[in-house]
């Protein structure tokens, strides 16, 4: 959902190629465990043989029903996510942060202060949970920040302005 290019058509046209998608990242519902797989028909039949009879819980089924009944919901959320991501990237560029913004729902940011200390302060002082990672290319020790809607990114940015000096 976070990358405009897709390999779905490639998966439909080629054997042994599958594309999987999950809704948990886009909707911030890690426990939902709802997604789908796209691929050539014979391959899908093989996958169906491996599935258990009740592999989706009641919550996930209600969620899927809501998605079917409101098809514009996904596009709306994708656009909100992209707006928030672009807002964060603009802030990072304007404030001379080094970062790696690939096409997922997160990015790596090299803080101006010690990453471990900043993560601890973010949690304790701002109630923001982020992680640190080692050896991310030229960034070295950096933050792994999940991106989201603009309001969430504004909260994160305000915390960065306050704590990362």
Regions found by a protein language model. Give the residues of each.
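Conserved PLP phosphate-binding loop immediately N-terminal to the Schiff-base lysine helix
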Residues: 1-8
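Basic phosphate/pyrophosphate-binding loop/patch that engages nucleotide-derived ligands
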Residues: 9-15
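PLP-dependent aminotransferase class I/II
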Residues: 16-92, 97-100
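Short acidic/glycine-enriched loop/turn segments that link adjacent beta-strands
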Residues: 31, 103, 137-141
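Short beta-strand-to-loop capping motifs
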Residues: 39, 109-113, 147-149
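Hydrophobic side chains in well-ordered alpha-helices
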Residues: 47, 118-121, 156-159
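Conserved PLP-binding catalytic core of the aspartate aminotransferase-like
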Residues: 82, 94-126
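PLP-dependent enzyme catalytic core of the Aspartate aminotransferase-like
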Residues: 124-125, 135-165
């Amino acid at each position: 959902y976070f990358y405009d290019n897709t390999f779905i058509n490639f998966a439909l046209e080629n054997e042994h190629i599958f594309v999987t998608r999950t809704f948990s990242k886009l909707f911030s519902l890690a426990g939902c465990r709802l997604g789908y797989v796209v691929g050539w028909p014979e391959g899908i039949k093989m996958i169906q043989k491996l599935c258990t009879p009740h592999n989706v819980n009641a919550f996930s089924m209600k969620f899927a029903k809501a998605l079917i009944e409101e098809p514009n919901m996904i596009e709306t959320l994708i656009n909100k996510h992209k707006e928030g991501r672009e807002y964060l990237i603009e802030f990072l560029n304007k404030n001379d942060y080094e970062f790696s913004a690939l096409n997922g729902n997160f990015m790596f940011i090299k803080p101006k202060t010690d990453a471990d200390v900043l993560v601890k302060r973010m949690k304790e002082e701002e109630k923001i949970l982020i992680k640190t990672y080692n050896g991310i290319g030229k960034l070295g020790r950096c933050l792994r920040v999940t991106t989201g809607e603009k309001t969430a990114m504004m909260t994160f940015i305000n915390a960065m302005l306050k704590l990362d000096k």
